[in-house]
């Protein structure tokens, strides 16, 4: 079964996210558990935690199909100690918020070397950052999102995801989220080589590590390494790819999350994607 949703607003409190997801016809969703543009946020209140859990139960959202996203400020591969320490503390806080909410996944962008350290040194720092957070938490899987490779962002090549996973001590608590826009603009031509691209992912990383996907069309061309999302079917990826993806059983039983640019289209996009599973 396909679990399809979008990255919904948690404005006013995390407890509103499941309500917003239900209203667009979703059976999965993503959210920020805190303000994603601030380093420090107020702790979650007991009321918010209770209401979030109640609303998830009320609208039928299981933790396996909720994919929270961490703050954009965090860089787990930061080349400088101050930035690294700050990022690690913020990431741990995000993991602990997921624990409090009974969530099982935390999606994050791996990190950037900022042209100050080598790719491998940065990847080593990312893996160590994950290990430190996993040691201090229970039950939450760190889900590495592949990137477009914009600027000095890492995670745009499958081998880099594998490199990080290889260095994470608790393999049961690390996973991957594939973003369709990022995969395309990173240079993986799944329009012409669908079987080869996902075959390569299976061989290099392994589908056992795939915990979710972000379903986004792309405003930018294949291999551009520029991250600009578009609405489903309106960008350079197009409808046919998503139709194929929806019929592919390898993507069953995980959150498939829209981060497309026009949220007024989300109910329509979710309904269309669901139709393609028939």
From Swiss-Prot:
User: Gene3D superfamilies from the entry?
Assistant: Divalent-metal-dependent TIM barrel enzymes (3.20.20.150)
- Which top EC class applies here? hydrolase
Asked if the Swiss-Prot or TrEMBL record annotates the protein with the keyword Metal-binding, the reply is yes
User: Could you say which EC number(s) this protein's record lists?
Assistant: 3.1.21.2
Pfam families from the entry? AP_endonuc_2 (PF01261)
State any single GO MF term.
phosphoric diester hydrolase activity
Q: Describe how the cofactor binds.
A: Binds 3 Zn(2+) ions.
Cofactor names: Zn(2+)
Return the similarity comment: Belongs to the AP endonuclease 2 family.
Cross-referenced HAMAP family: Nfo
**What is the name of this protein?**
Probable endonuclease 4
Organism source for this protein? Answer: Bacteroides fragilis (strain ATCC 25285 / DSM 2151 / CCUG 4856 / JCM 11019 / LMG 10263 / NCTC 9343 / Onslow / VPI 2553 / EN-2)
Q: Its gene?
A: nfo
